[in-house]
Amino acid sequence: IMELVSPLGGVYQAGTLSGNPVAMAAGMAQLSILREHPQYYEDLNRKGDWFYGQIQRLLEERGKPWQVNHVGSLGCLYFTEQIVEDYQSAKTSDTSFFAKYFNFMLAQGIYLAPSQFEAMFLSVAHTQEMLQKTLERITTFLQKI
């Protein structure tokens, strides 16, 4: 695979921790854990389906036409009525409203990516209790707006 990466191959790759020995060791450890516990992927995807489904349910119950897109454990809440299928439709999101949501969640101890266009990432470390707490904070936000 390394022969495909520049300078030998045609794929350019760069990043903050590229080639960093600590990052490489962490990556190798992670791969070992995943080999030992292949069910983590299935569990994580099920967790994502449930969590993002709950956000969608909360929005629907309150008549909010916003979009919740997700694939497995990755998801994004878009503050737009338009179905989000690509960059153009994502750009219809109300980014100033997202800023209010972000700041509210941050004040509640829920750390999200600071951009409307960055995904939320669930991990095997997220417990049901943590996800429920997040949903409770989202509910509070929806009640306050």
What are these regions (language model features)?
Residues I1-I145:
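Conserved N-terminal phosphate-binding loop of PLP-dependent enzymes in the Aspartate aminotransferase
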